Amino acid sequence: PFQSRLLTVYCARGGMRSKSVTRFLSSEGFRVQQLEGGYKAYRRHVLDFLKDFRPPLIVLHGRTGVGKTLLIRSLPGSIDLENLAQHRSSIFGAVHLQPRNQKNFEGLFFSKTSSKPRKEFIFVEGESRKVGKVFIPEAFADAMKKGKKILLKASMETRVRRILEEYHPRDEETLFKIEAILPALKESLGKNVVEQLKTLLQQNKFEDFITILDRKSVV
């Protein structure tokens, strides 16, 4: 229940609007605090932090399905960038997810990293600077380039199985979304391959569908 949690109330600049709401909620028995300076001050604080956040990193690389994300989620002191962005950083990366905007991503990134010791190694998955529609902070992206790198490998069979588990169409709507993405691949794969992929998808031959995409380095 909300009354047992500490709530933070804010407005643009931390003025009377949030102050009035804070007082009202407090009088109703809620544990509540007002964000000093409001959202604008918070955003400045977040951006100032991200501008200089360059921790030592261990960066995991490897093809889709080798288990990078599984390993990241099992390691203490790791940052799951794809989870923060709610995007898997591929053309099908938004399937089953709700991608976040830049401000939300930066806020979550700040919450995840601001309490970490600056000299402590952090595990992270190798990404381009853009994950879906959001950009990794420039300083952190620079730290990723300079970090220690580990290459993970797995058999084709294992990778296809893992990709299938993560991207498997769970309903007609998801199937439609995946099919709607295929025309964007015509330039890189050619019309014939895209038509083949569309047929495999419609026939529920998902392993064959993923195998072709994997061989073409699309997923």
Regions found by a protein language model. Give the residues of each.
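Catalytic cysteine-centered active loop of the rhodanese-like fold, especially the PTP/DSP P-loop
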Residues: 2-35
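A short glycine-rich beta-strand->turn/loop micro-motif centered on a GG-aromatic cluster
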Residues: 28-43, 83
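Conserved phosphate-donor/acceptor-positioning beta-strand/loop module used by diverse small-molecule
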Residues: 125, 143-165
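Helix-loop module immediately N-terminal to the HCX5R catalytic loop
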Residues: 1-6, 44-47, 174, 181
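Glycine-rich phosphate-binding P-loop
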Residues: 17, 56-76
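Activity-critical C-terminal alpha-helical subdomain
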Residues: 156-187, 191, 195, 199
